[in-house]
Amino acid sequence: MRIKVKVKPGTSKNEVKKIDENLYEVRTTTIPEKGKANEKVVELLSDFFDVPKSKIKIVKGQTSREKEVEVGE
């Protein structure tokens, strides 16, 4: 399944919210430095969808706050 993700780095807590059918908002306490925020986004989505981190892949938007993510099963 492919989803769109809006990332809000540097927030006070880590959370994933479903906004629409294929749109999610991910808030992370991690700052966007050297890919650390992307790693945290993958970890949070992995927990949210209950799949291993290896099944989550950022397809578009590596350096953007708006990303396209592939979630495997």
Swiss-Prot record:
Transmembrane segments annotated in the record for this chain: none
InterPro entries associated with the record: DUF167, YggU-like_sf
Pfam families reported for this sequence: DUF167
Superkingdom, taxonomy of origin: Bacteria
GO cellular component: cytoplasm
NCBIfam families: DUF167 family protein
PANTHER family: UPF0235 PROTEIN C15ORF40
Family per record: Belongs to the UPF0235 family.
Protein name: UPF0235 protein SYO3AOP1_0257
Lineage, uppermost ranks: Bacteria, Pseudomonadati, Aquificota, Aquificia, Aquificales
